[in-house]
Swiss-Prot record:
Catalytically driven reaction(s): N(6)-carboxybiotinyl-L-lysyl-[protein] + acetyl-CoA = N(6)-biotinyl-L-lysyl-[protein] + malonyl-CoA
Gene: accA
Keyword annotations of the record: ATP-binding, Cytoplasm, Fatty acid biosynthesis, Fatty acid metabolism, Lipid biosynthesis, Lipid metabolism, Nucleotide-binding, Transferase
Family designation: Belongs to the AccA family.
Entry protein name: Acetyl-coenzyme A carboxylase carboxyl transferase subunit alpha
Protein's pathway: Lipid metabolism; malonyl-CoA biosynthesis; malonyl-CoA from acetyl-CoA: step 1/1
GO cellular component terms listed in the entry, alphabetical order: acetyl-CoA carboxylase complex
Domain CoA carboxyltransferase C-terminal: 36-293
GO terms, molecular function: acetyl-CoA carboxylase activity; ATP binding; carboxyl- or carbamoyltransferase activity
Organism for this UniProt entry: Dichelobacter nodosus (strain VCS1703A)
Role of this protein: Component of the acetyl coenzyme A carboxylase (ACC) complex. First, biotin carboxylase catalyzes the carboxylation of biotin on its carrier protein (BCCP) and then the CO(2) group is transferred by the carboxyltransferase to acetyl-CoA to form malonyl-CoA.
Assigned EC number: 2.1.3.15
Amino acid sequence: MNPEYLDFEQPIAELEYKLNELKQFSEQSKVDISDEVERLKTKLERLTGDIYSDLSDWQIAQVARHPKRPYTLDYIPHIFTDFRELHGDRHYADDMAIVGGLARLGQRSVMVIGHEKGRDTKAKVSRNFGMPRPEGYRKALRLMKLAEKFKIPVITFIDTPGAYPGVGAEKRGQSEAIARNLYEMAVLNTPIIACVIGEGGSGGALALGVADTVMMLQYGMYSVISPEGCASILWRDAAMAEEAVTILQVTSTRLKKLNLIDTIITEPSGGAHRDVAEMSRTLHDAFLSELDRLEAMDDATRIHQRLQKLRAYGNFLGE
């Protein structure tokens, strides 16, 4: 069993292994087996499409947490140019679980902010596995205020298990930092686009998620609590997480029906981790198109629509 593949992806892993073996044999033996290679490629594409066309909610949640799934720092060099990272909250520290800075999207200057989990063990520890402390959210707000001052659009990438629940974070005002971001983002006088690229966990995600347009990748997840946390509370058993996922309705299609997100961004066959370049091109075009729409509005209309959308969350529509 290949640990870089999820359980339901093992048939894909086996076929990819055979395909790589065939390619190596062809290179070493100088035998032309291009027809067989193409046949296996076609079979692999069909198999991947079949598996990913019928994923359960739990399987989608697993894809959202895939060990190879692209993070914020994977997307930035593919989507933006001239990225200049900015550091610190000017109050306490520089939280590496939040990255942000100025960049160019086409001919536009933008402020890019996102959660970052880290790829290897050292990076994961230094970035606290993508779980921000209060100083991370205050850094994000500082950058948003800077963007507002210079009339620069804000683009956020959401990918976190949740805000860090440690004692130190609570002492430094974790709940206040999150609440302040919600309050300020609701009326920030510049266009805001938020995109859930992996897992969006609770208030830790929402603190970057108040926006004019909320996008979500096809195999992302967005929820008030992690499935394991929900299962532990409801059933006293984290092993019930699979059932909790269905109840929580964490997937993009379910959230779109509830009008909790605005746009679902289609991923490459087999998920974003299979083709980061293609996924980045799709996001690049989606951001440009949406900024054209948002910047065509006057400020008062855009903020009014943002507030109306927020007020509509959770409306009871009847039986």
